[in-house]
């Protein structure tokens, strides 16, 4: 029969197993950042595309939280622009908000992204313009705090508030998304 001490040991052991399994044995530097092959090829797909992705955070944080980002491709563009917040940039004196031409659907340091929103075709160019315009006024472009925010999930949540016709809903595990409200 289990007594209180045995229950505590069982709970502690279970938590340790979860944490250990959530921690990668490798370095984030060695983790995949390749395309997950979710986004349509921009040289073939001529229509406008908006994708919002979510992927488990790095290491043990991935047990609880996700990283979210936005990728856009205007009509007839040959590449995607990725809009995301990356916290380590702050330590290097860079804005945490990164808006650059990049692979739209990269693995997030080993975690395969999940497509949480897709908009394509007619009217999407106008939405892209609104996203880009709103991003210029993001109030925390140089500020990052893992918890409670502002963090990587605050930016897409803020865009969702500024561009409501996007109809973006972030996953429950997007901690920091409430900071934008």
Question: Predicted segment positions?
Answer:
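A general structural-boundary detector
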Residues: 10, 56, 142-143
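Glycine-rich catalytic cores of cysteine/serine-nucleophile enzymes that process amide/ester linkages
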Residues: 26-39, 43-118
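A cross-kingdom signal targeting lumenal/periplasmic-facing segments of multi-pass membrane
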Residues: 101-135, 139-142, 159, 163
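Activation targets extended, charge/polar-rich intrinsically disordered C-terminal tails
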Residues: 24-36, 132-181
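Soluble non-cytosolic domains of exported or imported proteins
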Residues: 63, 118-125, 146-151
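N-terminal Sec-pathway targeting helices
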Residues: 1-12
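C-terminal motif of bacterial Sec signal peptides marking the signal peptidase cleavage site
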Residues: 19-22
């Amino acid at each position: 029969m289990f007594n209180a001490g045995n229950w505590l040991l069982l709970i502690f052991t279970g938590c340790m197993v979860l944490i250990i399994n959530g921690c990668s044995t490798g370095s984030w530097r060695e983790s995949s950042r390749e395309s997950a092959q979710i986004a349509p090829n921009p040289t073939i797909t001529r229509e406008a595309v908006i994708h919002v992705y979510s992927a488990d955070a790095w290491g043990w944080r991935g047990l609880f939280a996700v990283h979210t980002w936005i990728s856009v491709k205007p009509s007839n563009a040959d590449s995607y622009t990725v809009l995301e917040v990356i916290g380590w940039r702050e330590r290097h004196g860079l804005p945490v908000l990164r808006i650059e031409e990049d692979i739209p659907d990269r693995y997030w340091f080993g975690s395969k992204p999940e497509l949480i929103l897709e908009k394509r075709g007619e009217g999407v160019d106008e939405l892209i313009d609104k996203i880009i315009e709103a991003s210029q006024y993001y109030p925390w472009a140089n500020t990052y705090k893992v918890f409670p925010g502002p963090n990587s999930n605050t930016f897409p949540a803020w865009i969702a508030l500024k561009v409501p016709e996007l109809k973006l809903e972030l996953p429950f595990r997007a901690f920091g998304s409430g900071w934008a409200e």
